[in-house]
Amino acid sequence: MSDNDGLMLMNFTTESGPDNASSHRRVKVTGGKWKERRKLKMKLEGRPLRPKRPAAAVEEAPAAAVPEGSAIEPAAKRPRGRNERAPKDVPPQPANAQVVSSLFTSTRAITTSVNDHERASNDVAPSNAPLLQDTFEALGVRGTLLEHLTGKMKIQKPTKIQKMAIPEVLNGKADLFLHAQTGSGKTLAFLLPVLQTLLSLEQRIDRHSGCFAMIVTPTRELAAQIYGVISTLAQCCHYLVPCLLVGGERKKSEKARLRKGANFIVGTPGRMLDHLQNTKVAREQLPHSLRYLILDEGDKLMELGFEETLKSILEIVHSVACDNTRFPRLPQRIVHVLCSATRQGTVSKLGDIALTDPKVIAASDSTTDVSTVPDQLLQKIAIVPPKLRLVTLCAAISELSRKAPTETTTRTIVFISCADSVDFHYDVFSGLGGSHRDLVPGTVRELAAGSRALPCFSADSPPNTVFYKLHGSLPQAVRVATLRHFSSDAAATRGKHLVLFCTDVASRGLDLPRVSTVIEMDPPFAVEDHLHRIGRTARAGVAGESLLFLLPGEEEGYMEHIRAHHPRGWELLRYDRDLLAPAFAAPVARSDRPTTATDAAWDSNATTWHLNVERRVLEDPSAKDLAIKGYTSHIRAYATHISQEKRFFNVRCLHLGHLAKAFGLRERPKGMAAHRGKPATPKPKQDDARTKMLRMARQAVAQSNSEFNY
């Protein structure tokens, strides 16, 4: 046993003080509430509890002493504690206050002041006009079809693309790629030789003879237009029947028409592939009759993502061998025809897929692949600040309405980037003042006397203006009715100015009669879309105008980007001097109270008109909803420009507040985030294993006791 047995050695410290950390024992307390555990732990460790200061003491605490004569001022007292909540009876302050700003202040400077690509002269020869020295008879169109074409349809001379393409299609020995400007007559270039070939057959044909030609188009509107052209041409041979296959229609009715028989099938890719796969009669007649497969607007077919669908259609068509025993004078193979106004990009890829050793037929004499606009088209460009976009569009439409002749119908197309923005602009121009009547419910409105939509309207004369809207979100029947009304020359439209607000759904292939002006309020998503948009005017040798809106800054560089497509130049307009000042020279009445006409300046009249729109958006919940949807959709659409043009159209360079004013909104852009989508609904909580087992057991017992369980 050692000397230390039974002894305890202890070390004591003689130091004391509050700063000595060893004096506090670390104690672990478990159980109970957090506050109680905290108090008990501090008590056991010997640390004093800090007394809680009342709120009154905080407010009455003296401020820190400030030296006399110092420039530093004492900090202001806080009205309440940091964690103290506001009284419940005080209404919360709005997080998104309204901002009323002037139209003509704080706008971005326009750097382009001189037009370095001025249009030389307006006296130019049309580039897509009919050729006066040639005839259809010399091209091989004869007999009944020639008489109907020149007599009933009043088409006397062929265009350049028709002169070059009709003999090649009649020959039927090679695939063709037709390239020509918009409005040059590509549709008749492939329809006339197909009809002439059928009329020259020795055997009598009718609707039961089979389908001789399939025509694939990217949009329903273009398919309906080609169907109408075939129906008009077939009036001279009533036994030839076309059939239209597009989405939005009843497939049962289309199947019935196919069973009755059709010699021409026109449709969109998806619906046509559906019938080729699921309608037996559509495939049975292919070997004996099908000899022409035509792809119209090939670049748009690829742009809309129809590549795989077209491959499937071609695979089905090519899987059947041609049989010429019934019609020996038909071509020995299927002739493929690809039509497009552009030759670059994805259309060349489609040519590699669909065509075999094609022969390119181009109406242009240029050796380059750059597509150009018609020579007789007068292009105008206006650089407009974002706040002034709406009022400048009003000025442009007002001047067109004021100058429109009352003897003939004038048509104007306004291209906008998205469907929600189309709905907003249609509602503003057709609903401002409330004086209108619906010609087609929801899409066509005729303005009545008393309308304040345009500054050129007077109270003692009818406006003679009809507004339309068209986009892909409308039902198919409504789209067809709207387009038919816009194209008609009936009493409801004769002698009036027809204005169509639309998306790019109306930019491809549509041959709308006498479209005098095209306004691109939103720049196109690609240069090809720009060419097709302005191609709705200046068709078949007729003069036309186009107006393009650009924002100051980066978008001004877009003019250099499209310079090669406008070899004859353009006119550069000033938005204030050339557009706003002439249109708003007349006084504009306020919508909130009756006012007498005064000779105010044009900028005051423009401000009054825009304030009328803002008040309508502020007072009408439905109008405000349209404005917010149009604004947010416009921002999203602006961000979808192709990568090659992002340097001109960068969404980060937009002034969102100024752009919101162009939609009549006074809210800050951040405050409109709640309107961008439907409120999220919480997901239902999933049952655990036990609850799920009990629920299924109860369902089994209830089912066994049911009176229908025999």
From Swiss-Prot:
Tell me which Gene3D superfamilies the record gives.
P-loop containing nucleotide triphosphate hydrolases (3.40.50.300)
**Taking every annotated instance into account, which residue ranges of this chain make up the domain Helicase C-terminal?**
396-588
> Which residues belong to any copy of the Helicase ATP-binding domain?
167-361
GO cellular component terms, A-Z: nucleolus; nucleus
Residues engaged in binding ATP:
180-187
* Motif DEAD box per record, residues: 296-299
Biased composition (Polar residues) is annotated at 11-21
One matching Pfam family, short form?
DEAD
Q: Which domain of life is it from?
A: Eukaryota
What is the uppermost EC class here?
hydrolase
Reactions catalysed according to its record: ATP + H2O = ADP + phosphate + H(+)
GO BP: endonucleolytic cleavage in ITS1 upstream of 5.8S rRNA from tricistronic rRNA transcript (SSU-rRNA, 5.8S rRNA, LSU-rRNA); ribosome biogenesis
Q: Report the CDD domains cross-referenced here.
A: DEADc_DDX31, SF2_C_DEAD
Main subcellular localisation = nucleus
- Stretches of Low complexity bias are at 54-68
The region called Disordered is annotated at: 1-97, 669-690
Q: Where is this motif: Q motif?
A: 134-163
Supply one GO molecular-function term: RNA helicase activity
| Cell location | Nucleus, Nucleolus
Task: Provide this UniProt record's keywords sorted from A to Z.
Answer: ATP-binding, Helicase, Hydrolase, Nucleotide-binding, Nucleus, Ribosome biogenesis, RNA-binding, rRNA processing
Q: What's this protein's function? A: ATP-binding RNA helicase involved in the biogenesis of 60S ribosomal subunits and is required for the normal formation of 25S and 5.8S rRNAs.
Its UniProt miscellaneous note says:
Present with 1460 molecules/cell in log phase SD medium.
PANTHER family, per this entry? RNA HELICASE (PTHR24031)
Similarity comment text for this entry = Belongs to the DEAD box helicase family. DDX31/DBP7 subfamily.
Domain observations = The Q motif is unique to and characteristic of the DEAD box family of RNA helicases and controls ATP binding and hydrolysis.
> What is the name of the protein in this document?
ATP-dependent RNA helicase DBP7
